[in-house]
Amino acid sequence: MNKSHLGTADNPQEVVTAHDIGRLVDVVNVGKGFLRYVGPIHGKDGMFCGIELLEPNGKHDGTFQGVSYFIATPYHGIFAPIFRVTLDAEELPKPPPPNPSNRLSRSALPALQLRNPLTQERKPEEDVMSTSVYVSSSTKPIAIPTKQCRPPETDPMQMSMFSDMMDGSMFSNGSWSDIADSMITSNCTFTVRKGLPIDDDGDLMSVPMVQSVFNIDREALRREEQLQSSIVLGESRIGVEHLPIIEDENELETPLVETRTMPLPNDLNANFSNKNSTTTFVEPETPKVEIRENGNLDNSIETPPQQSPSGSSMVSHESDSSSKKDDTKSDKSPTKKSQKMEEKPVVKKKEEPAAPPPPPKFPVKQKAPSKHQLMMEQLKASIEAEKTKPKKEIKSRVSLLPPPAPKAPQKENKEGGEMTETPRRTITKTPLKTVNAKAKTSPTPPVERQKKERKPLYVAPPAKERVEKEKKIPSKPVVSPPTTAEKKPVVSSIPSTSSASKGPFPTSSFAGGKLQGPRKTSSSSTTTSAKKQKNPPIDEKEKLSRLQHSTHAFEATLIVMNRINEDNERKLGNISEQYEKKVSELGDLKKMLDEARKKFEEDVEQMKNSNQQVIRNHANAVESLQKTHETQIAEKNKEFERNFEEERARREAEVCAMNNRHQKVVACLDEKISEAEKQCEQLNVDKKVLQAALANDCDHRNQMLTKEISSLQTALEMKSAEMKELRQKNQNLSLQVDEIPLKELEISKWKHKSNEYKQMLDQKINGEKILVQQIEDLRRKQIHDEEEKEAMKRSFDLMQFKYENGDDPNVTSVMSAPMESRFSTPTKVQFRSRSSASGSRPISMATSNGGDQRLSTSSHHDDSMNRSTISMYTSHIRLPENHADDVIYAPDEIISSRSGSISQRLAISIENDGEPTIKSESSRIGNTSDSGIGLVM
């Protein structure tokens, strides 16, 4: 695709962009306010404007869904779509003068008519304050309202169009959802200018891209790239050979899409079309309209090459010719610009036939037909079928009857003359799908009957009937020719009346339904076959009946035509009334324009007078200022000369003083220079002496340096040897230092062991002391026991002597008892519990005397340790070495307890030899202590 290298046209109404932030804007049905934000909103599609309203009619303070887009007073902020916001009329800047070299841009494909705001209904209030400029061959008015009454719907930016310099925040408001339902041509092509105008030769790529300050994103850049190039929606519907070529001779031509005319609308649609001020027609011509900055509306109209007129095309040509006459009348009247209140004449170019388009300059590639092409072919086939209807045959058959009224205007139209104005009528558009569907589902053509001889039809009817018919024809005035849409129901109504009265009409052309091309051929073949056959004779009655049928059919056509004429008269009256209203409105507007001109001229005169007065005042002021300036300059010159003389005298005195000081300084410097020369001579002599001394000193030093170096080397070797020894010692010491923690651990271990051994030694010493005391006690006890034993022996001897003598009976009874029974009790060692250990032992019969009591009382206060020690020693002395049955591991309670007496644990058994034997647990404990158990006190 080739990019457009055209400039940009002017927009009569400024579109709000991010560059207009802070300006006063007007929101539709809301009010005025200041623009604060332009850009997208989170959660919403499209571009929105944030406005701070002057009145508290808003809904928020600039925050929407938690996101703050701008700051405003509460209930003064509102978000509105960008197409509903327009700059206030007072804020609109004055446009620069128009560039006469602007060219129109156009699309390579037929534009799709969307919801065009120019075709919307407009209120009568707006029609009063605005003038409608009708473009030639078009019935859609382009309204140019006056100041402060322009509705936002008339903004050309709302149409489906794009510009190379369009800002990223501007979008068209067209709907692309009904593309198939609105396949018609576009009557106007606009080029929107946004920014500064450029030269014709300038390239658009060199123009800086207009970007928003607050809305810079990748999406905007991507959209601008799309806007800068032409976009083809789908494939071409008209063929590659018919596409226009850039920089071609017929550059302003636009290919057309042929449409099918719809049937005649009913009365309701007709009335509705009369009420609506804006009507829509499908037109074969596509004029280009350029709206410049100064408000002039230039209409350049070029008609593409037309084919042979058909039934449908004739209707459009007739309606176009009638609309052209109205447009020429309306275009001659002056119109008003909405912004400047100035008269902007509408220049209309004469309609000139366009030259046929040249052949394509590029090779046409054969492609497989697409769906759109097939649809277009079907549509063209249906149109060709309508063109090939047998119209001549119908005219020849009806020519016998009086000519109908609508014939004359058609001939005038064919000859090129003008016709009366016909009312505009809205024709409902149907998509191609429905047209094709109707073409496919059209009723089957009726079976052709054999035509009979038409010779009796040439017989003239009676004179009375012909006079009546001739009188009925001129009774209705001819107003306007009927369109093909109006003719079709007439043709279809004729067979209905004839069939209701009697049999079908002999001619097949009056049958119901639409005639197509194949029917013509079939009818011609049937007529030829009928001529070849033999025609039977026809009776007079049948002739009269046929003539009556034809007269009835003609009367029906006359009735229909009369009704149509009445409707046309009524429509013409309405149109004339509307025209009168428009003329009155135009007169009012002219009066207003004259008043405005007068007011403007008065203002201009007043401004001229005030300007002249200001000029005179300015000249007087300049002269007075010049005089005062000259006087001030003279005074300043005198003062400057006086100051200059004073300054010159002062400077001369200073120069003299400086010369005197300079001479004195020169004399001093001469003396110093002479002294410095003498010092230089003396220094040169000293230098020579010092150089000689330095040479001698250097030789002596060089000789001494070798000796010093050798001595230093020997000292270095000695130091290195000492360093080696010290390093070895350091290594040994480091090893010893590493062994210190191990030695400390061993020392701590040995200290712990020594403490343990000391404790054990102390325990043993204490045990020995205790044992020595126990031994001494035992010796004393042994001595005491021996003494008691001797005493007992003596007493026993005495008792035995007495027994032998038989002096005492008690003694004899005792002695008479056996020896075993006497000493059986003390021979047993009794082990008692802890509770019984504290108590005293019962006295035996053998110890009933005082010695036994004394023994028991003396031994009652001894310790259990003493008892165990005695048992240990006694067992060690008395018992044999292999005797281990008596070893008992006594519990700690026996060792630690100090209560009780030995008498409670010991029992003395007197054996035959008379030596006591101790049998107790202590003996076993003693053996265990000797075997290695240490005593802990």
From Swiss-Prot:
GO terms for cellular component: nuclear envelope. Residues 566-740, 773-800 form a coiled coil. The keyword Ribosomal protein does not apply. Residues 90-131, 264-548, 819-866, 916-937 are annotated as: Disordered. InterPro entries: CAP-Gly_dom_sf (IPR036859), CAP-Gly_domain (IPR000938). The lineage of its organism: Eukaryota, Metazoa, Ecdysozoa, Nematoda, Chromadorea. It comes from the Eukaryota. Residues 39-81 form the CAP-Gly domain. The keyword Nuclease does not apply. Residues 492-501, 832-844 have a biased composition (Low complexity). Keywords: Coiled coil. This is CAP-Gly domain-containing linker protein 1 homolog. Pfam families: CAP_GLY (PF01302). One of its GO terms (biological process) is nucleus organization. GO terms for molecular function: microtubule binding.
